[in-house]
């Protein structure tokens, strides 16, 4: 993996673009296949905290791995589970009440579009997303129970570094790509 190094001045000249971990500059509202990089997705999701930080640090990457584990049956289904929140690597995570507010239609559309591009770039069948939703909802209920309910402390939250590593291990084990 070759990382792109730029100066602060070069970064300033790229208004409207987001710099990724690997040094790419992307427009998150207009992603294309060349923008998508699994290392960026893993790194970004491992540094985004679920539940707007209300609980312990628990990354979107760790959540995504656990959803993937629930989506067993086929590699494509598990891969769709792993990548169901991948658009958040470029758009960030929003709390569900905010994301689903009437005024957030443009965000939801951007997230859907980014998901389609990511799935296309990584060869994942987007038809699995509806089935993944059931397991995502199940994981949400488990997470609430682990952090604030009857099973507080039952989940060991990973560091961002561990979550990133585990995310990439899961991705490469499902795709057979190294």
List where the protein language model places each region.
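Metal-dependent phosphohydrolase cores
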Residues: 1-178
């Amino acid at each position: 993996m070759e990382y792109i190094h730029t100066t602060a001045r070069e970064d300033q000249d790229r208004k409207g673009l987001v710099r990724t971990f690997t040094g790419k500059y992307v427009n998150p509202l207009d992603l294309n296949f060349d923008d998508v990089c699994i290392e960026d997705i893993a790194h970004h999701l491992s540094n985004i905290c679920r539940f707007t930080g209300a609980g312990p640090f628990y990354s979107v990457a760790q959540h995504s791995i656990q959803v993937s584990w629930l989506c067993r049956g086929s590699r494509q289904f598990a891969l769709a589970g792993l990548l169901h929140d991948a658009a958040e690597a470029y758009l960030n995570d929003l709390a569900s009440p905010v994301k689903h507010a009437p005024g957030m239609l443009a965000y939801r559309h951007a997230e859907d579009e980014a998901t389609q591009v990511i799935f296309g770039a990584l060869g994942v069948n987007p038809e699995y997303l509806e089935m993944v939703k059931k397991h995502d909802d199940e994981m949400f209920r488990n997470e609430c129970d682990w952090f604030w309910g009857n099973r507080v402390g039952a989940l060991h939250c990973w560091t961002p570094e561990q979550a990133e590593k585990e995310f990439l291990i899961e991705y490469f084990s499902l795709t057979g790509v190294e």
